[in-house]
Amino acid sequence: AEHPDVRPETAEFLTLLREQTERLAQMTKTLLEMSNLRQVARNERIQLAPMIEEIFTDLAPLSDKLGVTLTAEGDGIMTGSDALIYRLIFNLTENAVKYNQPGGSVRVSVTQELEKLLLRVSDTGCGIPEEYQRSIFQPFFRVDKSRSREYGGAGLGLSLVWEIADLHGGSVWVEKSSEKGTTIAVELPTQQSAKP
């Protein structure tokens, strides 16, 4: 046991306290990231396929643990903040893994058009009820509070996705969702406008 010299209920309380502290620290870090987004330079050339492969590698421990298969298709090149676009795709993919079912799958696809990219993250989870499909991009919103407690997190992941897409002149929305799964789409311009 983690706390061999204390009673089980005290040990459980200490574990919960540690989890809450970690969650609060993560929330503070994410809020600081969000408040500093506008200062981040968005002039890097980003190729998405290698970035998605890197994200899959980073998420392998979680996807392996939950038995979720990750697949990618397509590629695209855009100008923006490498760190922020990584965070956007990571958050969407991590969410799709967490809220999937055991043995499920997540597919990340990129379609490049002349002046924009369309990124889709599809999962085989239980879906997002229609009345929540806009709310999920608001800070601290959660559809399934018991699930979010199980996996931790501050309820800011999709809000950060929305902020990053908006900062790059793009948009994000729930393209489709049912009890068979959800697809979240992100449209991003390939070039950033000159305004700060």
Predicted regions span which residues?
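Short alpha-helical segment of the dimerization/phosphotransfer core of two-component systems
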Residues: 16-24
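Conserved glycine-rich
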Residues: 169-170
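Short beta-strand/loop element within the Bergerat-fold HATPase_c
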Residues: 103-115
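Short helix-loop "hinge" at the ATP-lid/N-box region of the Bergerat-fold HATPase_c
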Residues: 96-97
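Short conserved segment of the HATPase_c
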Residues: 128-142
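Acidic ATP/Mg2+-coordinating residue in the GHKL
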Residues: 123
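Short conserved segments within the C-terminal catalytic ATPase subdomain
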Residues: 62-72
